[in-house]
Amino acid sequence: MTHDVNPQAADENEPNDAESGAESFDPATFDPEAVPVEDAETAAEVLDFWAATRQYAGMAKASIVVGQTVGETVPPQAWSFGDEPELAERLLDAVLAGDKTATSSALWDYDSDDAPLPVAGELSILLDGENHPRALIRTTSVETTTFDEVDEDFAAAEGEDDRTLESWRAGHEAYFRRNLPEGREFSPDMPVVCERFELLYPRL
């Protein structure tokens, strides 16, 4: 799973539309291709979700204001966990329950997709197994280490299975073997991006 996240800087002092006199965004007139998701239907849902939840990231509630740059107006990157709908649902449920506050990816995935690594402060919209937006999270820390150096604390933070390091290694080895880019093979010293995050919406 690649986290190609579009950062959105929170500004508690950002004026609302009434104060600024700016025209509010109308989702019906916005180009879905500007939203960082793969299909127009999901793009429309993501826009609506972002409009309703961006206040939880410290931003004004209105989703987009005419006149801003594209980088300031598009929602954060929207993505789902795992490589199949059932896994996406299970891991999303763990986030919504407060059990999952971390995720990990192979560094090679970012190289293969020519995608930037996540950084602290970036926002993401989490999709369920049917590509509907369900949660807004903010990355709090990112560390690149090797598979065999991931520790018990991080394994527990991933909130999967019995939350032990042993089960983390078994599950993620199987996942990486299924999903590594062509030409890459699993090894205990392969580089892994370990990302921690906080749930902004819905609030626990």
Feature names for model-found ranges:
Residues T2-L136, T145-L204:
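Mixed-charge, low-complexity intrinsically disordered regions
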